[in-house]
Amino acid sequence: MQLPWWWELGDPCAWTGQGRGTRRMSPATTGTFLLTVYTIFSKVHSDRNVYPSAGVLFVHVLEREYFKGEFPPYPKPGEISNDPITFNTNLMGYPDRPGWLRYIQRTPYSDGVLYGSPTAENVGKPTVIEITAYNRRTFETARHNLIINIMSAEDFPLPYQAEFFIKNMNVEEMLASEVLGDFLGAVKNVWQPERLNAINITSALDRGGRVPLPINDMKEGVYVMVGADVPFSSCLREVENPQNQLRCSQEMEPVITCDKKFRTQFYIDWCKISLVDKTKQVSTYQEVIRGEGILPDGGEYKPPSDSLKSRDYYTDFLVTLAVPSAVALVLFLILAYIMCCRREGVEKRNMQTPDIQLVHHSAIQKSTKELRDMSKNREIAWPLSTLPVFHPVTGEIIPPLHTDNYESTNMPLMQTQQNLPHQTQIPQQQTTGKWYS
């Protein structure tokens, strides 16, 4: 008897000697069955809500393990799958993300990261990000929504901001919570503020940097901006010294006393550090004075009348055609005068040409004319200059070859030369002897 598919998930049947006994599920199999059902129905997840603060770095990791269970065939408990998964993120209803939000995923086998610094304009407005995961092996997709609820910060923006350039880090490495925490701890030891936040992280490639060579584990570099509520420390101010500025202009490393606190993990380019004091910046914002929204009275509007006066275009038509025609006629007359009235003539040319040159030219023309006439009519007798006069052996005078009833036009050239009636074949004498090479 064939059992239902759902019953095969249970414990194998326990048969008694009398026949079929009671069938049941073991606790382990029951847990497996419930886990499978939960995995199948967990494809429909609820939207995830996050609450970042404006002006503070926001980091959200898209974990591959979170999406692996949503691609069929669903993995069994304890089974590990390593399918390549990529992510596509966009603002709901739009093809791309908001301007302040960035996304990076180095390889399909690594997690994706959403990061950025929320702006104050989006405070109180939920930002819905659609996250679509693609399984590159099975071509299955899964979609979730990330709702970003931006909260207002207490002291936004922080008045003192410093931007560091770290040469031995990539963006995805710096976004790790442990690495970012270690960097903020080192900055806090140097700066010693009461409040310190990471404001933004930017890759050096986004600032015009070059892609590093794949040798010696070279990194792209990353810019990290932090903000604090106290003025800059004396160590950070050392970058502004004239001696250090001179060394930076000569592409030499400046001498910073607190560099050893970062050197153990972070290689900072102190020549690219930027210190911004918001308290000394003069605000250029001008308050907009709003009016009443009423346009000044310009009188009653008077549209043009419907009955327009007729306009005569005859004069314009004549001017348009007459002027180009007159110019063309003048040019034609000038060209005709040059070509017809300014010619020297044949008589004048012959008078200025020497007689011997004219005779030579006339002979050439006569010969050319005779050859053309001969090519047109081949039935006439050959020129006497081309016929043999004396016999090559006897010396007798040979009568004319062509008679009136002789068709020379149908005779091949070789035949006329070989089968002449008064022509004697002259045997060729062959010389005997040895050939020497």
Curated annotation (Swiss-Prot):
Keywords: Cell membrane, Cell projection, Cytoplasm, Cytoskeleton, Glycoprotein, Golgi apparatus, Membrane, Transmembrane, Transmembrane helix, Ubl conjugation. Glycans are attached at N200. The chain crosses the membrane at residues 318-338. Its main location: membrane. It is found in: Cell membrane, Sarcolemma; Cytoplasm, Cytoskeleton; Cell projection, Dendrite; Golgi apparatus. Residues 339-437 are cytoplasmic. Residues 1-317 are extracellular. It is a single-pass membrane protein. Belongs to the sarcoglycan alpha/epsilon family. This is Epsilon-sarcoglycan. The gene is SGCE.
